[in-house]
Amino acid sequence: MIASMKPWPLVMVAALCILFCLGTLVDAYPTKPESPGPDATPEELAEYMTKIRQYINLVTRQRYGKRSSPETLMSELIFGENSNSDHSSRSRFDDSYMW
């Protein structure tokens, strides 16, 4: 007899993997601080403002380095690394056919 596989275990495993991946993505992004409300003390407002400042600094921080988009990756594969900088630093007199 041939045992038939039921699809529900595979569906459950796939759903759990998707939920796990979504959970890690949600935890990676910082949450916005809660507002203290209209009747907050000056100390609570100062603490809220420092939390907001830290939140904004995290969300809008500059990312240093070259960003890799699919276009730049393909141009690096085809033309070699730093193909854009080669063209910008060359002069028109560097070409041998000019002389």
Swiss-Prot record:
Expressed by the mandibular venom gland. Keywords: Amidation, Cleavage on pair of basic residues, Hypotensive agent, Neurotoxin, Secreted, Signal, Toxin. GO terms for biological process: feeding behavior; neuropeptide signaling pathway; regulation of blood pressure. The modification Tyrosine amide is found at Y64. Residues 68-99 form a propeptide. GO terms for molecular function: neuropeptide hormone activity; neuropeptide Y receptor binding; toxin activity. Residues 1-28 form the signal peptide. InterPro entries: Pancreatic_hormone-like, Pancreatic_hormone-like_CS. Pfam families: Hormone_3. Belongs to the NPY family. This is Goannatyrotoxin-Vere1.
